[in-house]
Amino acid sequence: MIHSYENGKRAESCIEYLGRIERDDTLRIVLLPIPTTRDGKTILNTKVYINEVLDEIIGDTVVCGYGLTDSFCEAVRSRGGRVLDLLNDEDFLIENAELTALCTVGILLTTTEYAPKDVTVGVVGYGRIGKRLTNMLLYLGANVRVYTTRESTRTDLGECGVASSKSCCDADMSDIDLLINTAPAAIFSAEKIPHGLRVIDLASGENFAGLTVEKYPSVPAKMLPKSAGRVWGRAVERFISAACRNA
């Protein structure tokens, strides 16, 4: 049995994928949204309290979510269930980052009037998403400037011929045509962003208070839901397989 608290094509694709894998017929799988909650109490886009999920743990049950609290995970385990927090699954995070970067490139190619080689893109953050996005943009011929607080990263980028600047309030953005934020925390204040600069924010939360930006949180679920669902399904499959090997 598979019960999903997320609706839409991503969840449908995940369920379809899991329906094809070899697993114990008695195994129950509970899929919680990605991310699972915003307020720490209710499941995202529902009126269901997250602790109500505990009532579904009957026999061998796997609960899969994203950003789950320690207390919730402990409660699941105390009832005999198993917990997969996708936030701790590096393979999932990498695959999701690749999809996010690919979606972002798709947005740029379909909403700008210039070829990549004629655009200078500022990428804020050089984590999983920022790194893959930078590589894709460079491959397409775009000019890229990476904004990151890590001095070692800036040194490495410089050795590869990639422009970079320290992420701070007085960073120079005068030569940037487009700014893409991948960092989870606010770095630039609205007054430091050049007037008229297009800003795309891939992170959740309000990172550019007072500034109009294009928000694309969880963009794979919107643009590539079938692939996003398979990434989700593969994570659950790995978890189940690992549990079987360790049993």
Give, region by region, the residue ranges found by the protein language model.
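Glycine-rich adenosine-cofactor-binding loop
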Residues: M1-L18, K117-L138
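NAD(P)-binding Rossmann-fold cofactor-contacting core
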Residues: N7, L140-C160
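Residues in the short beta-alpha loop(s) of Rossmann-like NAD(P)-binding domains
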Residues: G8, T69, T149-E151, A203-G205
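A short, well-structured beta->alpha microelement
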Residues: C14-I29, E52-V53, A163-D170
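Residues at the starts of beta-strands that form the adenosine-phosphate
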Residues: I21, T26-L27, V62, T120, ...
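Rossmann-like adenosine-cofactor binding region
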Residues: P35-D39, Y49-V62, L157-L224
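Phosphate/diphosphate ligand-binding glycine-rich loop within oxidoreductases
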Residues: G40-A101
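Adenosine-phosphate binding glycine-rich loop
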Residues: R79-D118, G205-A247
